[in-house]
Amino acid sequence: MEIIDLSRELYHRTPTYPGQPPIIHGVWKTHEEAFVESGNIQGNSVMFISMPDHGGTHIDAPRHFGKNGMPINEYPLEYCYVKGICLDLRHIPPKAEIVPSDLEAAVKKAGVAIPKKGTVLLCTGHHERTFPTPAYATDNPGVNVEATEWLAQQDIVHFGIDSMRPGPMGVVNSLVHKACLELDITHMESLCNLEALISRGEFRFIGLPLKWRDGTGSPIRAVAVFGD
């Protein structure tokens, strides 16, 4: 069995979506402080983290798209353990729209069918090219509404991409989120290492969210498993 990590590392002030709270990570109690508190028996250090529910590699809950949408603590866990494929879209220029014909060509090139009730991961190469420079937050290509509709028509539960947003920055990205609400589909953002999945066929995707009450999304530890 081979497990490939598709998740960004979390650390203090790691890049976050523009306008959202920063990721803050620090020491709450050192080993030395805890050792003294224990009566010089054992010192157990503790860290703390503060972050938005859309920080790092994460999945959007339907609640993110609309106030009546399902919160992340109610999101079906069976949707987080599914078959998946990865499409090579690295030829798409920065800031460009991915259209249905791009997806159709990528599926044909991959030579593998899209799994029903599974996931489709879109490797644009954006993370590999730009992280952690400022361009990571602004220059990504992404799906447009028509491509989002095409993905939903494939009877998948979600799709994922190696950038901070599913669509290109601006109006198109907002319309893609609106389409996700209307189409009852969601997506994962800020994946990485998708290049390792290219031309390898179907895999098992695992990406379990935290059980945050009324959460609009959640960080996930996303992995692809071959030979499970």
What does each model-identified segment do?
Residues 1-228:
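Active-/binding-site microenvironments in catalytic and ligand-binding cores
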